[in-house]
Amino acid sequence: SNKVSIGALDRTLSFDRYSQQILQPMARRAAEKIEASIAALYPAFYWFDGTPGTPPATYAALADAGAIFTDGGNTVSGRMAFHSPAVSAKFAALIQGTYVDGNNKKALEMAKVGRYAGFDNYETVFAPTHTVGTLGGTPLVNGGAQAVTYATAKDTWSQSLITDGWTAAAANRLKAGDVFTIANVFAVNPNTKVSTGRLQTFTVLSDAASDGSGNLTATISPPIIISGAFQTVNAQPADNAALTIKTGSSATAYRQSLLLDPMAIALVSRPLDIPSGEGLKTSTVSGEHVTMSVSSWVDGNTLAENMRFDMLW
């Protein structure tokens, strides 16, 4: 919720742009909160591409990521990419000199990218920054036969992976959002179940610490399922298979771009049950994707009008 208070003197002398001064800023602030909450979901995304520390600023950077989408059975239409302002500026500079009708004009005049390399590209200040765990050692899978079934993993789409070989000291080695591959564990197309030729990337869902002997159990996604309708990989990892961290160097922060399938996230909103009466007036408006309630009341002591803007999502 957001709240604003408007004094009687302001309403009388200087308050002639109600929509511009109150409604639009409050709606924008609510939209930014939603955008930030969506960006904060990034640790659950297990596909990963690119070189940490090198912003994606080429056609190939986006197109290669799109190839991973296609190999993974995702739809070609409706793909979206969300970049930091710095990355968006680099893409705009890349295409402003081209002769694609419309896109180059937007890139030149407004530093906007639009549809490019198979994605609808957007600029956001909420592009997340990921800080890699402290890592350390030579992490290995500890024990074979760690595949799971769909029945055991379907509710969380995750599993525990037992590893060792970390530096022999208790420490928080992996952070939520760290991504890694396992030697000889390849992704499969979900429809054909044929290997894509790409090592499956796994994300860590919660911070994981090693013990004094260098053992660590991580909660990862996707689960390692080697057969059936929901197969995720071509084979389960062998004992002592090596883990390779893809998200960057120890304890280093990197800005991320988020590339999404149109069905990646469901935004669900519904009206709040707000009681009326006792001087409180509430108006609820439902838009295409969200619902906002605006409640107002007057402070009898100060004559200030208080307005509260609420959204549930």
Please state what every model-predicted region is.
Residues V4:
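Acidic/histidine-rich, surface-exposed loop or edge segments in extracytoplasmic proteins
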Residues L9-D16:
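Second-shell loop/turn segments in exported
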Residues D16-W313:
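Core alpha/beta structural scaffold of self-assembling particle/tube/pore-forming proteins
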